């Protein structure tokens, strides 16, 4: 444990020392960032918290990049010794997980090594990293971008990162985006801006299956359309994938397809957005045997709001790429200042509704089960909903600045959560109501107190929860006490005893460096970002996070 604390301290000092070295090698510059997350574990049988043999776990990275005119080189050293609980155990180890060379000018941009890339909305190709989820599916290969006035083209050949190795699949892709206004002179000055895009991605993987004849080359293509005029915008993308028998679809030979559409309007004091999506057998990976986080090539986002409040985010929706239909609507309206309803500074009303459901599936014939291995799987009517509801979330939030010192917001949320679909275990679905009050009091310059009161009411799962947080901020320093209480549940699928989860956290920020320490209990739960989720086990102990940039 002492060695790990010294290691974190050493890297912190190294980063602070490098900040003075921003001009090197003939006018080039060095920039980077560093983060270390350490957690000490104590056994707590009351909440199901285990003690790990190492007593302490550390996740850390140091990322550096050197730039000189059109040249750039970078690397990221990573350490998981061992990974913090909740991260995949295959992350255990340390080394350079990311490195690249890059050259760019006005027309050409060439990268060799690791890179992240996204075509369109990402339905058929998206490489990205979420450090707090333990997710990284970066590409390792060559990428070339060519830019003209009206047209930009991207091509790549690469493999995907799979923890400390590379996945078995070879990825080839090309994407093009055309600005119609720049391409056609007659509409060059039009207030209506139109963009068109096309993408194609192919995965090659050797077929070694002794039973089925699996396609070695699997292609997917997508087209997109975007229109902007004033405060109005419309976006739509459609994608299709040829038959791709894989571990996530039970090795069926059905083709996949997906569509996403968004329409929005905004002006002063008013904003509205409506999003729709449908995906059918569209889980696309660079390895046909991969499941979970592994080798994800395409990305189908969850059509739901990503909540920041703890209890509102208790039951997050996990995107179902192989079959879902969903929508999300958001309306934001600000009542005028100096009116009876708006108050002195105006009042903001934020209303959001999201819904996700299964797609309709029909057997291909009387003798074949839906989704049977080695078959075409099923047929599906495009506009027909299935009989299984996955999720819904209705929430409304009112926010008002009372005066220069006080700011208040209240929120109500109603939620339905399908346990089998979202968490994979057979338990009653959750019907929940969440009520939140949030108060900020700025009593002196650079001094404020922030109080949150939250309550979650449900008869299912662990029963009712409540939480109070009191936070003090003073120019670079903050401290917070969080008291989360599970009221227990003796009417659910299992008996849950009441329990208190206290947590104290302190933090200090100096320029671009932030240090945060905490001690207490954390509940078992699910953490999601954009519909990508990981399970987090219960824990009791000390946490330390250091992050900095230079």
Model-derived features: positions:
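Outer membrane beta-barrel
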Residues: 65-160, 186-188, 268-289
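Long, low-hydrophobicity, solvent-exposed regions enriched in small/turn-prone and acidic residues
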Residues: 52-54, 58, 62-67, 74
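Exposed, low-structure sequence patches enriched in small/polar residues
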Residues: 35, 50, 57, 187-191, ...
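Bacterial Sec-dependent N-terminal signal peptides
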Residues: 1-31, 550
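Short loop/turn motifs that connect adjacent beta-strands in outer-membrane beta-barrel proteins
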Residues: 21-30, 66-70, 103-107, 111, ...
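Short glycine/proline- and aromatic-enriched beta-strand/turn motifs that initiate or cap beta-hairpins
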Residues: 25-49, 354-356
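Hydrophobic, small-residue-rich alpha-helical packing segments that form membrane-like cores
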Residues: 135-184, 189-212, 216-221, 226
């Amino acid at each position: 444990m002492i060695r790990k604390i010294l290691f974190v301290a050493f890297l912190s000092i190294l980063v602070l020392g490098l900040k003075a070295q921003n001009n090197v090698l003939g006018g080039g510059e060095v920039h980077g960032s560093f983060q270390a997350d350490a957690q000490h574990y104590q056994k707590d049988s009351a909440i199901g918290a285990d003690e790990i043999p190492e007593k302490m776990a550390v996740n850390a990275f140091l990322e550096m990049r050197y730039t000189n005119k059109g040249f750039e080189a970078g690397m990221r050293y990573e350490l998981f010794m061992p990974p913090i609980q909740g991260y995949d155990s295959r992350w255990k180890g340390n080394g350079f997980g990311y490195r690249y060379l890059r050259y760019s000018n006005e027309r050409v941009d060439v990268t060799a090594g690791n890179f992240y890339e996204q075509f369109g909305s990402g339905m058929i190709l998206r490489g990205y990293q979420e450090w707090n989820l333990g997710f990284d599916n970066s590409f390792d290969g060559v990428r070339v971008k060519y830019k003209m006035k009206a047209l930009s083209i991207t091509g790549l050949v690469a493999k995907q990162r799979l923890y400390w190795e590379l996945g078995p699949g070879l990825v080839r892709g090309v994407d093009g985006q055309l600005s119609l206004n720049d391409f056609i002179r007659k509409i060059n000055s039009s207030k209506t801006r139109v963009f068109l895009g096309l993408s194609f991605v192919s995965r090659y993987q050797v077929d070694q299956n002794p039973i089925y004849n699996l396609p070695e080359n699997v292609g997917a293509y997508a087209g997109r359309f975007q229109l902007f005029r004033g405060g109005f915008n419309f976006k739509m993308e459609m994608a299709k994938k040829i038959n791709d028998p894989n571990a996530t679809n039970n090795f069926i030979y059905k083709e996949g397809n997906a569509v996403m559409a968004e329409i929005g309007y905004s002006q002063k004091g008013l904003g509205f957005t409506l999003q729709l999506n449908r995906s059918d057998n569209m889980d696309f990976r660079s390895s046909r045997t991969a499941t979970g986080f592994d080798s994800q090539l395409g990305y189908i986002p969850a059509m739901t709001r990503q909540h920041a409040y703890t209890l509102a985010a208790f039951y997050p929706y996990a995107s179902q790429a192989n079959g879902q239909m969903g929508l999300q609507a958001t309306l934001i309206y600000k009542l005028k200042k100096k009116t009876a309803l708006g108050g002195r500074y105006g009042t903001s009303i934020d209303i959001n509704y999201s819904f996700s459901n299964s797609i309709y599936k029909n057997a291909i014939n009387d003798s074949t089960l839906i989704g049977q291995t080695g078959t075409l799987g099923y047929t599906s009517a495009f506009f027909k909903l299935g009989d299984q509801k996955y999720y819904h979330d209705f929430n409304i939030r009112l926010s008002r600045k009372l005066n220069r010192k006080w700011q208040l917001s209240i929120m109500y949320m109603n939620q339905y959560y399908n346990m089998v679909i979202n968490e994979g275990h057979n338990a009653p679905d959750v019907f929940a109501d969440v009520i939140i009050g949030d108060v900020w009091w700025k009593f002196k310059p650079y001094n404020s107190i922030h109080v949150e009161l939250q309550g979650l009411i449900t008869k299912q799962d662990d029963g009712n929860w409540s939480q109070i947080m009191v936070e003090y901020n003073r120019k670079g320093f903050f401290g917070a006490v969080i008291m989360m209480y599970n009221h227990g549940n003796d009417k659910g699928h299992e008996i849950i005893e009441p329990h208190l989860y206290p947590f104290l956290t302190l933090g200090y920020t100096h320029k671009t460096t932030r240090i945060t320490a905490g001690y207490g209990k954390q509940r078992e739960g699910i953490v999601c970002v954009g519909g990508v989720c990981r399970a987090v086990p219960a824990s009791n102990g000390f946490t330390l996070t250091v992050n900095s940039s230079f």
